[in-house]
Structure formats: structure tokens, C-alpha cells
Amino acid sequence: MTNQHSAPLTYRDAGVDIDAGDALVDRIKPLAARTMRPGVLAGIGGFGALFEVPKKFREPVLVSGTDGVGTKLRLAFDWNRHDTVGIDLVAMSVNDILVQGAEPLYFLDYFACGKLSVDTAAAVVGGIARGCELAGCALIGGETAEMPGMYPDGEYDLAGFAVGAVDKSAIIDGKSIQPGDVVLGLASSGAHSNGYSLVRKILERAGARPDQDFHGQPLVDVVMAPTRIYVKQVLAALDRHGPAIKGLAHITGGGLLDNVPRILQPGMAAQLQRDGWEMPKLFQWLQQQGSVADAEMHRVFNCGIGMVLVVAADQADAVAATLREQGEIVNRIGEIVPQQDGMAQTVVV
């Protein structure tokens, strides 16, 4: 029954623009097409995406991961930088499943906003597609949710979902790690996607501007640098060195102190050398401007190390050489030692 005294309402009147959503899908399809890989049977456009596990996996185990970008999005809104957070979104999930030896196969995203800006959303999804290309996985589906009243104009939230596969016999679980094994660290590209609540607090205290010079670069480029994706490089090392790589840790929230212990068995500890790598200028500046203690830095930020590998001592040089061939900056940052009474499982000395 209609109200004869009121104009008819449409979905657009309620704040949902179906035409804008359709326009975004048209923008997304060619971006997703660039990420396609063998195994994709049906991608964007259907009710569900279909993927056939590659036959090279003899006894495949599926590995899944999901994550977001956290409060780094607040800076994306404030500084109008939307083309890199999509890479962050992919990186957070694919790097997580990589540590168990999995090859990422496909990725799905969720983009939620109050009012859909096609240009902003397309910039974000363009970053997601680029991240998928870097990881070698297909952007196989996603959801764009325009929800009036749920988010302020110009703001959005992101979630990502990655699925990969590893042969059951090749799962990396850290169980073979023993004292004497070497800890290698792969350089990060910046703060990645963690610790940004503290980053923002420090930027506010310092009165920082996105366009101010930071060692020859605009500060926005340094602070918003996308999370490095380690997938192809580490998979190449796994293909060549296999069991010599005993453990992998993605250095995310909790920094080195909380993430390295996740791959260690009871009674083992990682002793990291403070001078084993140079802390990048961004972290030095953040620490100085925020008067942040060393222990807090190591527990909040990656401090320049985005991925850790624990490798057999007699293969450490060979593994490092392979990773350098793949374009990684590799440092020998410590070793595995027996855990003494009262000793944390990761210490920086």
C-alpha cells in the first residue's frame, strides 16, 4: 500500500546507488582478469567462484588466511592515498599462509562503505589486483557493500581472504628447529600494516605533513609504502632448499618479540643481534619523535624485518644467496639457542 501524499522512493533515495556499483564492477573486471592463473574455472560475476587445485600437488592441504589493513586506513582517508592499501590487504593474508609453505592460489576481498565512490573503490581494487599479481594468486571474487549511515562519507573498511595449498609432506611447522639454526631476516618496505595507531599518534605529536620531505621523499610515500609481498621469492627458496628452511614467521602485529615465538617449540629461543641489521630511517624517526623505548619498538613494529626464516646452519649462506637472487635484502640476524629459565622465547641483545 503506497502513501498517496508522498513521492515514490527509490533505493538511491535511501543512499544505495546500484548504477555506481555496476560501474565499479565494469572497472574491476579488467583488473581481475590480469590476475587469472591456471585453475580458475569461474571468477567474478557468478554467485560463487570456482577453482581447481593444481595437479602438481600430490597430497594437497588447503591453507587459508584473512586479515585487514587496520588503522593505516585512517591515514589513507586523511592523506587521500588509496592506491596502495589494496596491496597491503593482499600482503597481510598471503604472507601469513606462506609461512606454512603454502602457495597462494586465490584471493577474495570485501569493501564496505557508506557512500560508494567509484574512483576511490577502483583505486583500492587496483591495488588489490596488483598485490595478487605480485603473489601469483587470482583475484577470484569479492563483495562491495554500500551501507548508508554505517560509515562517514569518504571512509571504508577492507577485509581480505587468501587460500593456498601445500603438499602435506612439505608443511612448515617449525618442529625441526633446533639450537644452532640460523635466523635470517628479510627487509621490510616500511611499517607494513601494523602499529599505525602509534604511527598516527607520533605523526600528530610531530605535526607532520604528508608532503614534507623525508630523506628525499614525500613523507606520505614512506609512511604509506605498501607491505612487501614475499611469496614468489620465498617459494623459489623453498623449491631449491626444501627442508633446510625449518620455520617462517611473518612479522606483523606484536613485532619480532611476539611473532618469532609462534614457530618455536618449548625450550627453544631466538637470540637476535641488535646490530644484525640496520633499523630503517622511518623507524629511527618514529622512535625519536615518540620517545619510544627499544622494547616497545620491537613489540609494535617490524623494525625493518618483515619476514623471518629459521634455516639449518650449514645451508644458511645458500638460502640467503637464493633469496638475494630473487631481489630480497637478507640479513643474518640471530640464532636459535636453548631457552634458559626466565628467558623469553625471542630476545634482542
UniProtKB/Swiss-Prot annotation:
Keywords, in A-Z order: ATP-binding, Cytoplasm, Ligase, Nucleotide-binding, Purine biosynthesis
KW Acyltransferase (keyword) present: no
Origin: domain of life: Bacteria
Pathway linked to the protein: Purine metabolism; IMP biosynthesis via de novo pathway; 5-amino-1-(5-phospho-D-ribosyl)imidazole from N(2)-formyl-N(1)-(5-phospho-D-ribosyl)glycinamide: step 2/2
Signal peptide interval: none
Any single GO CC term annotated in Swiss-Prot or TrEMBL for this entry: cytosol
GO biological process: 'de novo' IMP biosynthetic process; adenine biosynthetic process
Gene that encodes it: purM
Catalytic activity: 2-formamido-N(1)-(5-O-phospho-beta-D-ribosyl)acetamidine + ATP = 5-amino-1-(5-phospho-beta-D-ribosyl)imidazole + ADP + phosphate + H(+)
InterPro entries in the cross-refs: PurM-like_C_dom, PurM-like_C_sf, PurM-like_N, PurM-like_N_sf, PurM_cligase
Gene3D superfamilies the UniProt entry points to: PurM-like C-terminal domain, PurM-like, N-terminal domain
GO molecular function, one term: ATP binding
Lineage, uppermost ranks: Bacteria, Pseudomonadati, Pseudomonadota, Betaproteobacteria, Burkholderiales
Subcellular location: Cytoplasm
Main subcellular location of this protein, as a coarse class: cytoplasm
Homology family: Belongs to the AIR synthase family.
Listed PANTHER family: TRIFUNCTIONAL PURINE BIOSYNTHETIC PROTEIN ADENOSINE-3, TRIFUNCTIONAL PURINE BIOSYNTHETIC PROTEIN ADENOSINE-3-RELATED
Enzyme Commission designation: 6.3.3.1
Protein name: Phosphoribosylformylglycinamidine cyclo-ligase
